[in-house]
Swiss-Prot record:
The keyword Glycosyltransferase does not apply. This is Geranylgeranyl diphosphate reductase. InterPro entries: BchP_ChlP_pln/prok, FAD-bd, FAD/NAD-bd_sf, Geranylgeranyl_Rdtase_fam, Geranylgeranyl_reductase. Keywords: Bacteriochlorophyll biosynthesis, Chlorophyll biosynthesis, NADP, Oxidoreductase, Photosynthesis. It comes from Rhodobacter capsulatus (strain ATCC BAA-309 / NBRC 16581 / SB1003). Its EC number is 1.3.1.83. Catalyzes the stepwise hydrogenation of geranylgeraniol to phytol during bacteriochlorophyll A (BchlA) biosynthesis. GO terms for biological process: light-independent bacteriochlorophyll biosynthetic process; photosynthesis. It catalyses: phytyl diphosphate + 3 NADP(+) = geranylgeranyl diphosphate + 3 NADPH + 3 H(+). The lineage of its organism: Bacteria, Pseudomonadati, Pseudomonadota, Alphaproteobacteria, Rhodobacterales.
Amino acid sequence: MKYDAFVVGGGPAGSTAAWDMARAGLKVALLDRAGRIKPCGGAIPPRLIRDFDIPDHLLVAKITSARMISPTGRFVDIPIENGFVGMVDREDYDEWLRERAGKAGAERLTGTWLRIERDSGKTVVVWRDKVTGEEMKAETRVVIGADGANSQVRNEVPATKIPLVFAYHEIIKAPTTVANYDPTRCDVYYDGRISPDFYGWVFPHGKTASIGMGTELPDVSLKDCTTLLRQMSGLDKEETIRKEGAPIPLQPLDVWDNGKDVVLSGDAAGVVAPSSGEGIYYAHAGGRYAAEAAMAFLKSGKPADLKLARAGFMKEHGTVFKVLRMMQDKYYHSDDRRERFVSLCHDVDVQRMTFESYMNKKMTKFQPLKNLKIGFKNLAHLSGLVPPQWT
């Protein structure tokens, strides 16, 4: 077997890369392990739906507001103006993406990546077939590694270690009688009892809901914290359907390619947003940039073109990632700071700028007076000049 491109990982990043390259007329293989549902909150913003042609039938819920809840129980409801955030179930969503790539011409393979063998200048991918258990081999011109936070393909790249948040959630049957539950609202808990350095969440998914939390600290019990969150949110009596956990990377790698024939994408490249943990949009975007870089390399024969994947992604999204990392570093590490963060969220201009950036995946236009006001409030809270509840 010979391919122009061999994509490892069938999530949003890998499926998008395979879809784009297959539509361009290239011979593409898409290898996925199958049989595992990616633990994920499942939120997709309008720009994702537009840019990647996501049909409405995949949306299990449409979110029109978000509630931010502080350690003392204060909360602010933030409306999503002029639109909604879609929610997807990753089991159905990811399979639909793989099917779409297959319909475009990508050859779907099911199995586990093993290694790359290089002989006489050729790049040979080796994987284990899920059905037969046999080692399979295929020659390819380029490999796209989109195999998640614990990527094995990443071993081919001189990559640095990625900081990880360990996320855990429980899928429950959506309640019908819990007073504080709104099927069109995402609830976000900034509370050190739930997470000492990240947040907890309740995300509606139509007939089900995702409730969970994340942390970088290895000695925190994710299950105990989620149990407490269920009690605090009034969801401890609802039926549990399944429990899932997974690492989430929170920093893009400095290098995404090996300078020869491999380029990374999605979680494998570390492109999950700090502060929010949002990854689906950035996985799609990273997959597209990886495909563009791979196609440039295939056309020119110059391995340097593989660097276009990271360069393009960081040019478009790097500033947003820096701002979100700064916000996480400043506000997520004590209940005093978390209380202050929720206080900031009471400001209507903060709400509008935050959701405009989230919905469209770009920084909002600079508005001198509003930016000055928000900057003053940040300084006042970070310096402790005002009480935590000051809005």
